[in-house]
Amino acid sequence: MLVYVCCATGNTSGMFCKQILKASCREQIYVEEIHELGNHLEDALRENDLVLAYGSAEIIDEKFIRRYHFEYHMQAIWLAPQMRYLKDSMKKKLNCFDIPIHIIDMKTFGKMDGKQALQDILNAMI
């Protein structure tokens, strides 16, 4: 399962994904910057239960998704709370894909609560 976690530049979302990784007990989780992940996506998906890609919200559009073949694997996009204003425009840009877009809870993101974030991500997948 591939999930994209994004913020303005990717720095904070990267730290957040690393907190999710630390909080995981049973899940095999892999964390990687979205551009780097494109080079070995198939291996990461095969070897892990959850692949968390992180980066900037601004780069996500149809062309980017297709370039890396993410349309076949991306299960969800999670926007940092400060990027919530992009949700509607992102939905329009990605309307040809069936990728749900969620907003990360402000308290969860602010506290860098990896345990709660992992629970939220997994619950949204059910």
Question: What residue spans do the PLM features occupy?
Answer:
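Hydrophobic, Leu/Ile/Phe/Ala-enriched alpha-helical segments that form helix-helix packing faces
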Residues: 20, 24, 28, 90, ...
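Gly/Ser/Thr-rich loops at beta-strand to alpha-helix junctions
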Residues: 6-14, 82-85, 108-111
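Mid-chain, well-packed structural core segment of small domains
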Residues: 66-102
